[in-house]
Amino acid sequence: KDLIKSLPFKLTDSQNKVLSEIFSDLTNPNQVMNRLLQGDVGSGKTIIAILSCYLAHLNNSLSVLIAPTEILAQQHYQNFEKILVSLNVPLFLLTGSKKIDLKKIPKNAIIISTHAIIYQKAHLDNKISLLIIDEQHKFGVKQRSFLNSSTKLPHCLTMTATPIPRTISLTILGN
């Protein structure tokens, strides 16, 4: 709540409702979240992702946001950094050109990545508690199936600005 109060803008009623639902899912030990967050470009999906990852951080859990391109991953990283910089949240960027040693990541970190993390996922298997996928339909079939191959399924939030039937069916059916 302190982070929300410190934001330089007020969340909309819709954002507050979505956050309440996501926070309820993330704190319910009897359920694994699998949600689709659809909104136009600029509608505030990123702040929902930031606040959701921050809740995971506060609960000493690892969260990962995966973006389809390096440019989008860098934009997300910069947005997360702006909001979280004063809170000493361990924040990492992993792309094809920016490597990190996943074995040394604190368990309460936030990782922003491209599909590059998929190929190093073995180091994180069963450690990710929240997985946020931005524009899932832009990932290939092999990449999506690899993301879902953990023995312990994390909470999953899929964000999209493209309400196409394929995205909706992928989220509902999980394949």
Outline where the language-model segments fall.
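Conserved helix-turn-beta segment of the N-terminal RecA-like "Helicase ATP-binding" lobe
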Residues: 72-99
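Hydrophobic positions in the central parallel beta-sheet of the AAA+
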Residues: 35, 65, 92, 110-111, ...
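Post-Walker A helix-loop "phosphate-sensing" segment adjacent to the P-loop in P-loop NTPases
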Residues: 56-64, 84-86, 153-155
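Post-DEXD/H (motif II) to motif III coupling segment of the RecA-like Helicase ATP-binding lobe
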Residues: 74, 125-130, 136-175
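Pre-Walker A segment
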Residues: 1-64
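Conserved RecA-like ASCE P-loop NTPase motor core of nucleic-acid helicases/translocases
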Residues: 62-72
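Walker B catalytic acidic pair
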Residues: 39, 114-115, 134-135
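Conserved motor-coupling elements within RecA-like helicase/translocase cores
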Residues: 94-111, 118-128
